[in-house]
């Protein structure tokens, strides 16, 4: 317990970084947690029903009532943003711990956990970009009748 008491900032950075990394891995493995977005057909059906109700109310001379829908909380976006914020907080704690001349293992632990979390998110984003580019090439190749080679 004495080591943690001497290295409060870097130990806090390791805790932030470890929580952020676990959140990122669990969210990637078991997510998405929010409800899927509505389909295009349901959006069009809702809009046409609203137009029909508005036209009928206008013809009858009634007052048109509009219902404002609340936007749902996007749990996935909150998890991603909070994980990145915790990783940045871990890197800041590592920097402050280094300025305070705390123990190296605590500083390096905070750097590894915080940097690992940011690298994990960057790697996932990069894989998504590469896969989307390959998919576009595959679609163009299929449409033009050419080969990928």
Curated annotation (Swiss-Prot):
Location(s), subcellular: Cell inner membrane
Membrane topology reported for the UniProt record: Multi-pass membrane protein
Main location, first listed in the record: membrane
InterPro entries referenced in this protein's UniProt entry, alphabetically: Uncharacterised_IM_YidI (IPR016512)
Positions in the Cytoplasmic compartment: 1-8, 98-117
Transmembrane region(s): 9-31, 78-97, 118-140
GO (cellular component) term, any one: plasma membrane
Keyword tags: Cell inner membrane, Cell membrane, Membrane, Transmembrane, Transmembrane helix
Periplasmic side: 32-77, 141-149
Superkingdom field: Bacteria
Protein name: Inner membrane protein YidI
Lineage: Bacteria, Pseudomonadati, Pseudomonadota, Gammaproteobacteria, Enterobacterales
């Amino acid at each position: 317990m004495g080591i943690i008491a001497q290295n409060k900032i870097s130990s806090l950075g390791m805790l932030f970084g470890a929580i952020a990394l676990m959140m990122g891995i669990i969210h990637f493995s078991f997510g998405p947690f929010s409800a899927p977005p509505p389909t295009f057909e349901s959006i069009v059906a809702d809009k046409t029903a609203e137009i029909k109700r508005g036209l009928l109310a206008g013809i009858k001379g009634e007052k048109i009532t509009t219902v404002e829908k609340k936007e749902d909380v996007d749990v996935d976006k909150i998890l991603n943003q909070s994980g990145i914020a915790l990783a940045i907080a871990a890197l800041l704690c590592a920097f402050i711990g280094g300025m305070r001349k705390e123990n190296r293992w605590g500083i390096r632990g905070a750097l590894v956990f915080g940097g690992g979390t940011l690298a994990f998110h960057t790697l996932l984003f990069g894989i998504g970009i590469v896969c989307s580019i390959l998919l576009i090439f595959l679609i163009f190749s299929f449409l033009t009748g050419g080969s990928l080679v």
